[in-house]
A protein has these predicted regions:
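Hydrophobic, Leu/Ile/Phe/Ala-enriched alpha-helical segments that form helix-helix packing faces
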Residues: 32, 36-44, 111-119, 162-166
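Catalytic cores of nuclease domains that cleave nucleic-acid phosphodiester backbones
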Residues: 5-90
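Generic detection of long, well-ordered alpha-helical segments
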Residues: 22, 26-33, 101-105, 148-155
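Mg2+/Mn2+-dependent nuclease catalytic core
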Residues: 55-151
């Protein structure tokens, strides 16, 4: 079982053994492997692995970005270039079938992060914002070119949300 493999690697008894049935752990790992193999076949990951996308970078969402008086986690997971266009992608392990405006604007905030980074375009028009999300048994890709209105609406939403949390 997966728990036995974990225990061999850690050299002791895993806390999982008392919390989750071994068959349930095995099933969760099977699901994770299915998702992993599926994402390897999805765009843009497949294009990176096949060399169609040659200029790409990974970033940590743990990096904070200053937006006004707030420090936020708004960086993308993956950035790549296609000509002069810069793509900003975030992975969502469990997404909804039709992301609402709030999720769209949350993703647009990645452009704020990008425009503060050395080596990335300073012009919002050069960005395509993307989200690769898992829904109904497959990976789906949402994408949209950034507009000035999107960027302003994103900043407004973030400021409203932050004020609501502080009040």
């Amino acid at each position: 079982s997966v728990i036995e493999v974990i225990e061999t690697r850690i050299g002791g008894i895993s806390d999982l053994r008392s919390q989750v049935a071994p068959k349930q752990v095995d099933r969760l790992v099977e699901i994770a492997c299915h998702r992993f193999h599926a994402v390897m076949q999805s765009k843009p990951v497949h294009d990176i692995l096949n060399g169609k996308i040659t200029e790409w970078y990974l970033f940590s969402r743990l990096h904070k970005t200053k937006l006004g008086k707030y420090k936020l986690h708004i960086s993308p997971d993956l950035v790549w270039f296609s000509g002069k266009t810069c793509h900003l992608l975030r992975f969502t392990v469990q997404g909804v079938s039709k992301p609402g405006d709030d999720k769209h604007l949350e993703n647009v905030a990645m452009v704020e992060w990008a425009m503060q980074q050395k080596g990335l375009p300073a012009n919002y028009e050069r960005y395509i914002v993307e989200n690769l999300y898992w829904n109904n048994g497959r990976w789906k890709l949402w994408r949209k070119r950034c507009t000035e209105r999107d960027l302003e609406d994103s900043k407004h939403m973030i400021n409203s949300d932050m004020r609501a949390m502080i009040d």
